[in-house]
Each structure stands twice: as C-alpha cells, then as structure tokens.
C-alpha cells in the first residue's frame, strides 16, 4: 500500500517565494512604522527639554535666593532686592510672550487642544524658544505657576517640529505626533507616565483621535520622555510625603463629603480665573508696556511673599509635603489657602507662561489637610490621619476644575507613591467631578480655548472688513 509523500519545494520556487515576500514588504505602507519611530524621537526630545527646563528653573531660583543672602543684614534692602529680582525675571517672560509669541502665554494646554482640532496654528519655531525662556523667567522668579503647562506646549510643538523636519505627510501623523508630544510633556513634568497617557485620553478626549497607531505612539513617547527624566533625576516619587495609613471602610463617607466641597469650589474657582482674566485685560488694555509692567508687579509681589511667607508663593511642590505632615495650624492653613488662591488667580490669569496643575494640587492639599484636621477632632474614634485627606484633596480640585478625575487620581498616586489610598481618592474625585458637572460651567481649559477661538474669529473678521474697505477705496 503506497502512501503519498509531500513534494519538496524546488530551489527555484523557494527563491521566487522569497522575492515575492520581500516585494510585499517593500510595497507595504511604512507610515505607521514611521510614526512609531518618530514618536520615540519626540518622546526623547521632550524628555530632554523637560529636564533642561526643570534644571533651569531650579538654577534661577537658587541664584535669586543667593542674591538675597548678600543683603540679609539690611531688611529694607532685602525686601527691595527680593521684589526687583522676581519682577525683572517676570517682566522678561511677559515681554517675550507678548512681543514674539502671544500663543505661548498662559498654560498652553488649550492651544494644543485647539491645534488637535485644527483650529489653532502651531508655530513651533517661535513658540519653543519663547515658552522655554519665558517660562524660565516667570517660574524662576517664584510666581505661582506650574511647569506642566510649558512642558505640554513645548512637547506638542516638538511633535510638530519633528513632523515638519522629517516631512511626514497625512493628518494621522500630524495629529498623532502632536498628541504624543503633549502626553510626553506631562509625563516628564511630574515623572508620571501613566498620568501622561490618561491626560491625552481623558482631558483631550474630544480632540484625540483614538486609533491603534495613535495610542501606541503616545505610549512610546511617554516611555521615552520618562526614561529621559529618570536618567537625570532619581527614580523616586516626585513628592515625598512618606507612607500614609490606609482609610478604613467606615470612614469613606468623609471622603465623599470632601469631594462635595471640592465639587462646589471647582466651578467657582474657574469663574474666578475667567473673571480675573477680564479684570487684568482691562488693566493693561492690550498695551505691551502696561502688560509687562503689570506682570513685573505681580512677579515682584510673589518674590516678596517668597521671602516673607514662602508657603504662599512658588509652584507648591515644597508646600505639599509640609502641609501633609501636619506642620501648619488651622489658622495658618486658612491663610495659606486664601493667599494662594489670590496669587494663583493673579499669576495664571495675567497670561504669564506657566501652568496651573501644580498650584491646584497645592490648593487641594491645603484644603484637604484642613478638612482632615477637622475630621480628626470631630471623630476621634476613627483614628484618622489628616494626611490621607491631603492626598485625596490633591487631585480633587483638578478633577472638579478640568473634569479629568482619572488623570488627577493617577497623577497624585504616581507623584506620592501612596497607592493604598486609591479607593478614597476615587470617591473624592468622583464626588468632586459629578457635583461640578451638575452645577454647570465648562471645564477650565475648554472655557479658555473657547475664549481664544472667539478672539481669533473677531480678529479675522476685523481684518476681512479692513481688507474690504481698502479694496472699495
């Protein structure tokens, strides 16, 4: 009985099959692979830029404080130098923005959101230097601003720069690299890779085009930027608050109450930001000299506060562990909270190049600590720790203001390394977000973008009317 044996492939047929396979590989569209490779390039560059920005801000702050040491024996002179050093640095930042790249003012995150919707231009050749050096001036001067705004906008513009340099074509490549740079910027600012990914998916969900290629690119960019950050910095939590105790199940209702408080305060805070923008615009009226002088006055005030009451100035990273440890009395916490609300509104609403993430994290920490101290006194049977409410409050104001609870929760967990508090943080963040949504009002970045687009439309209409008038004459 015969059995069929498989025929062996001839050498000629094997060569032909290999040629066909190679031809198919060569003819395949390389765009997805090119995008992923460029995402790694973008993430690397963004990480290096974020590290340089962070080191530059720290160096300027050290130089500014070092200049005050030489005048320590003369108190009036000390206050004068403290005011002038911060005022000059702030004026430098305001001047760069107003003169060369107005779109580099403020956080920059709404600009990236507008660019993802094809509603705002990305002029990386002017935004990159202005945002970098302008942000060095304002943050180095001790203003109440965060570094995440500059790094996100710098990251998005680096994504567009890489796209233009390597001449990648197509909307998918442009959109993906822009989003990748923004996510990498946030991840490098806070050493929080997962928060960077969630920031794009959650905060920029109306603008982000979710595809397999785009999300892979964001992952790759965030990984590379975080690696760059950790090469030049320690691989530890950005904010050291120690390991806090867990929250017992019978105390979780207190975190819901804390979330309700933030849900009420968040929309009010957003209205204050927009109202302060209108007020300060009436002060300078669009005049560059008045605008720079106003910025110098605000920066000088922050410089004075940084010497007289350090907890009320700066981004707030130094304040968070001190407040969480319970080193402030209730009266001092109230003073710090009120003072930082005022300085945050003045600095951010004035159009200074800088973010608002870090100041809001500090505000949430202070308010959460105050709530925790009250809870400790009212419910001694629970054996509460005020620091756990501080951690829960950190992300709650962020959740209520920009309506990104997941980003706020994961960001705080990655920054503090207290993952055991994830359940109370979810409860606080969800309560804050839901109540803020029910009370109405737009998320902060969406409201700022809407204002920017309305102003852009008005300017375009005015130019078209002027052009029509000149043609008629």
UniProtKB/Swiss-Prot annotation:
It is a multi-pass membrane protein. A motif (Selectivity filter part_2) lies at residues 146-150. It catalyses: 2 chloride(in) + H(+)(out) = 2 chloride(out) + H(+)(in). Changing residue 445 to L: Alters stoichiometry of proton/chloride exchange. It comes from Escherichia coli (strain K12). Proton-coupled chloride transporter. Functions as antiport system and exchanges two chloride ions for 1 proton. Probably acts as an electrical shunt for an outwardly-directed proton pump that is linked to amino acid decarboxylation, as part of the extreme acid resistance (XAR) response. Keywords: Antiport, Cell inner membrane, Cell membrane, Chloride, Ion transport, Membrane, Stress response, Transmembrane, Transmembrane helix, Transport. GO terms for biological process: cellular stress response to acidic pH; chloride transmembrane transport; proton transmembrane transport. Belongs to the chloride channel (TC 2.A.49) family. ClcA subfamily. Residues 109-116, 177-189, 193-201, 387-401, 402-404, 405-416, 417-421 dip into the membrane without crossing it. The chain crosses the membrane at residues 33-69, 77-100, 124-141, 148-166, 215-232, 253-281, 288-309, 330-349, 355-376, 422-438. The record marks 203 as: Mediates proton transfer from the protein to the inner aqueous phase. SUPFAM superfamilies: Clc chloride channel. Changing residue 203 to A/G/Q/S/T: Abolishes proton transport, and reduces chloride transport. Chloride binds at residues 107, 356-357, 445. CDD domains: EriC (cd01031). InterPro entries: Cl-channel_ClcA, Cl-channel_core, ClC. GO terms for molecular function: chloride:proton antiporter activity; identical protein binding; voltage-gated chloride channel activity. It is found in: Cell inner membrane. Residues 70-76, 233-252, 310-329, 377-386 are periplasmic. This is H(+)/Cl(-) exchange transporter ClcA.
């Amino acid at each position: 009985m015969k059995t069929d044996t498989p025929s062996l492939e001839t050498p000629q047929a094997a060569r032909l099959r290999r040629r066909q396979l190679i031809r198919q590989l060569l003819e395949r569209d390389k765009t997805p692979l090119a995008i992923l490779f460029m995402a790694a390039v973008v993430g690397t560059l963004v990480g290096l830029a974020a590290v340089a920005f962070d080191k530059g801000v720290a160096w300027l702050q050290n130089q500014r404080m070092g200049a005050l040491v030489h005048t320590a024996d003369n108190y009036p002179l000390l206050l004068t130098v403290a005011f002038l050093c911060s005022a000059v640095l702030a004026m430098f930042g305001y001047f760069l923005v107003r003169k060369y790249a107005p779109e580099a003012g403020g956080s920059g995150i709404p600009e990236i959101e507008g660019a993802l919707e094809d509603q705002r231009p990305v002029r990386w050749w002017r935004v990159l230097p202005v945002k970098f050096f302008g942000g060095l001036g304002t943050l180095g001067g001790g203003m109440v601003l965060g570094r995440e705004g500059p790094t996100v906008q710098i990251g998005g513009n680096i994504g567009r720069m890489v796209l233009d340099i390597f001449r990648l074509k197509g909307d998918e490549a442009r959109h993906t690299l822009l989003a990748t740079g923004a996510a990498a910027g946030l991840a490098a600012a806070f050493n929080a890779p997962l928060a960077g990914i969630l920031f794009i998916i959650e905060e920029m969900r109306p603008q982000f085009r979710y595809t397999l290629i785009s999300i892979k690119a964001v992952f790759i960019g965030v990984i590379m930027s975080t690696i760059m950050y950790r090469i030049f910095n320690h691989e530890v939590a950005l904010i050291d608050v120690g390991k806090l105790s867990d929250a017992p199940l019978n105390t979780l209702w207190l975190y819901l109450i804390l979330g309700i408080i933030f849900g009420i305060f968040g929309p009010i805070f957003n209205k204050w930001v927009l109202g302060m923008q209108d007020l300060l615009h009436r002060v300078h009226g669009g005049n560059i000299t008045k605008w720079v002088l106003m910025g110098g006055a605000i920066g000088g005030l922050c410089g004075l506060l940084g010497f007289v009451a350090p907890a009320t100035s700066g981004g707030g990273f130094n304040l968070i562990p001190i407040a969480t440890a319970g080193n402030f009395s209730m009266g001092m916490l109230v003073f710090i909270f009120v003072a930082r609300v005022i300085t945050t509104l003045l600095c951010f609403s004035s159009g200074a190049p800088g973010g608002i993430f870090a100041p809001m994290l500090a505000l949430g920490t202070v308010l959460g600590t105050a709530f925790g101290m009250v809870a400790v006194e009212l419910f001694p049977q629970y054996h509460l720790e005020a620091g756990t409410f501080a951690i829960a409050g950190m992300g709650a104001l962020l959740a209520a203001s920009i309506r990104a609870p997941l980003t706020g929760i994961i960001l705080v967990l990655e920054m503090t390394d207290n993952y055991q508090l994830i359940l109370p943080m979810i409860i606080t963040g969800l309560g804050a977000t839901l109540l803020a949504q029910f009370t109405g009002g737009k998320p902060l970045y969406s409201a700022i973008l809407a204002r920017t687009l309305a102003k852009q439309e008005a300017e375009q209409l005015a130019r078209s009317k002027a052009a029509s008038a000149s043609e008629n004459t």
